[in-house]
């Protein structure tokens, strides 16, 4: 399983049940790198990918059905993802929901900088499971 998330500098994901930020460049990059696979998302994330309906499957239990999952509002500590892709906003936003993945089980495999539409720089990090 591959998990894709967006984080601020403190590992925040949400504030008051709302996403911290968004950038269309992230969605474009996610879809561009699907390599023919479907992206599984929750109804919460559907608005982000409405332009990519042929590439996306929306369902409540997407974490148990999908191989590639974009996650915004789920606890991830029990997921045994082989790969975690993080898009970092490179700033701090208010947050009350944080990423709970134990990254001691992962190693940074790749890192790239993206020029965002609403963010000057977005850092993409790809982590592979080592344990």
Language-model region placement:
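Enzymes that bind and transform nitrogen-containing heteroaromatic metabolites
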Residues: 1-131
